[in-house]
Amino acid sequence: MEQTLSIIKPDAVAKNVVGKILDRFESAGLKIAATKKLQLSQADAEAFYAVHAARPFFKDLVEFMISGPVVVSVLEGENAMAKNRELMGATNPKEAAAGTIRADFADSIDANAVHGSDSLENAKNEIAFFFAQREIC
């Protein structure tokens, strides 16, 4: 069964909408195979987003991701990655379709509520970054 990683970012955790977001995943037929709340360290955030290290927004992204707790989850189901990306909506919440997570819960392109894997290969690597295999069931 296909798996993908979801991160509910600090802005959405602070708004106390974690349950509403997780409910969207389950209502769309995705199973939450693993989930945990944690505080990323600067080293964690830099390592996770290393692919963006040369980009001008990298420093701000890292600072944002360590600004409060996050909720990381492994979502599982048929076409899990594409389904999650559809549920999230466009990166910029102003461009996100009505009813998507970002349209409903995000404030800006930076504080955009959620992260989702953008390829199956990245999903595998991102899941392994946060979860041991025995934690996923």
Swiss-Prot record:
It is an enzyme of class 2 (transferase). One of its GO terms (cellular component) is cytoplasm. Disulfide bonds: none annotated. Keywords: ATP-binding, Cytoplasm, Kinase, Magnesium, Metal-binding, Nucleotide metabolism, Nucleotide-binding, Phosphoprotein, Transferase. GO terms for molecular function: ATP binding; metal ion binding; nucleoside diphosphate kinase activity. Homotetramer. This is Nucleoside diphosphate kinase. It comes from Aliarcobacter butzleri (strain RM4018).
